């Protein structure tokens, strides 16, 4: 009995030893596959969650996709300063950047705003073609680059007032319509009255621009409205007179060299003693400030008859001050940019 008990105890001891050895072997085997360090399951979980929250955010670009010489230089300076910062080099870089920016500002094209063109159009009451010619003039002025102000002067009429006003509103042109009620027996008196009304309106509101009188039977080269914006005080140009019954063209206007006026083309001379040549109302333009600020151009501020007959005053000033009169176009004053038509009607059209 004693030998059997001893053999059983020895067998149990061996079993325990084998079990302990197996457990130690398994733990050592799996421990060898584990990474070196203090990472744990929880630390791995935190790292994974942090990366997942940051990954959807796209990287921010350093600069725009458009590159210039100035931007590339700035990038090089930033990299060099980050690698080896030095106060002297940073100051030199700032000086170079400022000089480059100043050069770029100088090279930029300076855009100057266009001056206002004020077109005055009187309408003859008895002209049977006035609606057609008014629409044709509107189609021409619509092609002129802004700013442009169209002042239309006509006699008040209940029947035709609505039609002309509606037509002017549909043109898309900035306009002002002036009406009068006076009756005139002379065509020239009616036209002068309408022009004086327009000039008083310009003077009262101090509209600053270049004033041009455009008759309804005028035909324009669109370059004409570009050239008159260059007028400082007074400007003049040649004008061609056309007639349906005559096979010839008569030219009126200045004779000039470059932009200097030397003489005038005269259609006819009624009085040889007349020293001042006649000038057509549509063959000159002037700065509107001569009306409400004459002292700016060396003219007296108060002249008798100026308020009553402004158109006569303007013509007188244009012909008297030759030094401020500029021929257009400046390069070739003989170029025709304005034509005036005469229609074969019993009613005389605007002049």
UniProtKB/Swiss-Prot annotation:
UniProt KW keywords: Cell wall biogenesis/degradation, Glycoprotein, Glycosyltransferase, Golgi apparatus, Membrane, Signal-anchor, Transferase, Transmembrane, Transmembrane helix
Membrane topology: Single-pass type II membrane protein
Subcellular location(s) per record: Golgi apparatus membrane
Any GO MF annotation of the entry: 1,4-beta-D-xylan synthase activity
Result when mutating residue 333 to A: Complements irregular xylem phenotype of irx9 mutant
Keyword flag Iron-sulfur: no
Broadest EC class assigned to this enzyme: transferase
Consequences of knocking out this gene: Dwarf phenotype. Collapsed xylem vessels and reduced xylan content in cell wall.
Catalytic activity reported: [(1->4)-beta-D-xylan](n) + UDP-alpha-D-xylose = [(1->4)-beta-D-xylan](n+1) + UDP + H(+)
Chain ranges on the Lumenal side, renumbered to this chain: 37-351
Biased composition (Basic and acidic residues): 89-107
Pfam families: Glyco_transf_43
EC number: 2.4.2.24
Role according to the record: Involved in the synthesis of the hemicellulose glucuronoxylan, a major component of secondary cell walls. Xylan xylosyltransferase that acts cooperatively with IRX14 to achieve the successive addition of xylosyl residues during xylan backbone elongation.
Protein name, as recorded: Beta-1,4-xylosyltransferase IRX9
Organism lineage: Eukaryota, Viridiplantae, Streptophyta, Embryophyta, Tracheophyta
Gene of this entry: IRX9
